[in-house]
Amino acid sequence: MLLLGTREFAQSARKQGQLHNGMRYWRNDFFKSSDDDVCTPQCYLVEQFPDSVNPTHFHVQNQFQLFTRGEGTIGRSPKPLQAFTVHYAGAYTGYGPIVAGPEGVDYITMRAFRDPGAKFVPQQRELMRVGPKRHWASEALLPMEAGELAALQAPRADGVHGPDPDGLAVDQIRLPAGAASEVRIAPAAVAMFIVVIQGVVERNGQRLGRLENLFVSASDAPCLITTTEAPAEVLVLHMPAPDPAYA
């Protein structure tokens, strides 16, 4: 499966929500996900309102969150969440709260399989299952300066994390103008998300700009992306398979 996540679709799907604690947010789905098929990936931008709190919770699927705007904190860590911080939480792993700063905080949530929704702690603690718990967070992955990016003579791929034995990995790829990069999936990963953080990339003639993305299942990898008149930069988030403990 290969899906393109576009801003046009996200804007058409934009809807406001509110949690039980009063936290308000906008949700922008980048592509359509079936509510009836667990094998449907999810990718959506959350715009969390200023000075609001997304309470501690867990999900039943592995997920990445890519923070894209604003500032906040997560859990007990004093480290600020800024663009472009990557946070990974495994299935049935509690995390949070996510506390938004005075300008709010935005983040893209990505899953290879559909999740029915957050399970809040302590209210839904009885739904937690026994098994491995895992989370990981990067430093802010700053885009390359425009002059340095324009001076590149060939694509440059930097490993940010992994690959781990279960397939968890994060890469940062920079492409000069008129270049091509065959993005390969990490061994053992079930899928990867390719997110544009600077410039424009193309996939089979479809142009993808900032925050637009590609979902690529392992069976459809590798994925060729190109640039034309200007350089670009992407993050590649490799999703581990569900742990057998939660099968």
Pin down the residues of each PLM region.
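C-terminal functional regions that serve as terminal interaction/effector modules
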Residues: 190-198, 206-247
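A short, N-terminal "cap"/entry segment at the start of jelly-roll beta-barrel domains
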Residues: 1-38, 118-169
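Regulatory nucleotide-sensing modules
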Residues: 164-169, 176-185
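Contiguous mid-protein beta-loop-alpha structural module that forms a pocket-lining wall or clamp
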Residues: 73-81, 85-121
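Active-site region of the double-stranded beta-helix
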Residues: 13-66, 71
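Glycine- and acidic-residue-biased ligand/ion/polar-headgroup-sensing regions
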Residues: 50, 59-76, 183-204
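Double-stranded beta-helix
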Residues: 100-145, 229-247
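Short acidic-glycine-tyrosine-enriched beta hairpin
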Residues: 75-94, 202-222
